[in-house]
Amino acid sequence: MPFEFPRADKPEDVGLSSPRLARIRDALQTDIDKGAIPGAVTLVARRGQIASLDALGYRDREAGAAMKSDTMFRIASMTKPFTSVAAMMLAEEGRLLIADPVSRYIPEFANLEVAVDSDDRSVNKPKTEPSRREMSVHDLLRHTSGLTYAHLAGPFLKSDYEDARVVDEKQTNAEMVGKLGRLPLTYQPGTTYAWSKW
């Protein structure tokens, strides 16, 4: 049985305003009515209690399926702050060292290769060299790991990323990590900042 968070009888019981919370709901409903978004779920909690929980619009507009409060979403880059906070909490507990090599936790990231820029356009695959040091957890948190998006990888690596189907919604995280571990990094770990979802 899933854990149920306690609910406040009314928002004012935890120091929030019902009319102000209604403004959030109204603004989202306006976007739903305009077709800007299909639906949304909002939850506002304070002092350990849920003050407001709303499911608005549709989880599947075409099928007419209403949004539910437990509908699951892909939240894209919003996972980054959650992941960073979780990593810092694990570090505080001594269960994760930020300076550790990623391969300590994900063996597929050991012995990575790094693409080397080349002016020789006659080759189909990028030249590679071994990474000078292992990718660290810190590198992942600050986007200096050498991993990147296919469209940012440059002409040589772009096709490698696309051919490997790194982004495939049907694969498991383990399958994706295996693919990433076989691809060359775009730069040496710790040397260059590049926004990445990995």
In which residue ranges do the predicted regions lie?
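Structural recognition of the beta-strand scaffold that forms the well-ordered cores
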Residues: 41-43, 52, 139-142
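Residue-level signal for well-ordered, solvent-exposed loop/turn and beta-edge residues enriched
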Residues: 49-50, 95
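Active-site-proximal loop and beta-strand segments within enzyme catalytic domains
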Residues: 3-7, 22, 29, 58-195
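Short glycine-rich loop/turn motifs that provide flexible caps or phosphate-binding loops at active sites
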Residues: 14, 34, 38, 56, ...
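Basic/polar N-terminal segments that are highly enriched at the extreme N-terminus
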Residues: 1-19
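Beta-lactamase-like hydrolase cores
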Residues: 15-46
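Short beta->alpha transition motifs characteristic of CBS
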Residues: 50-60
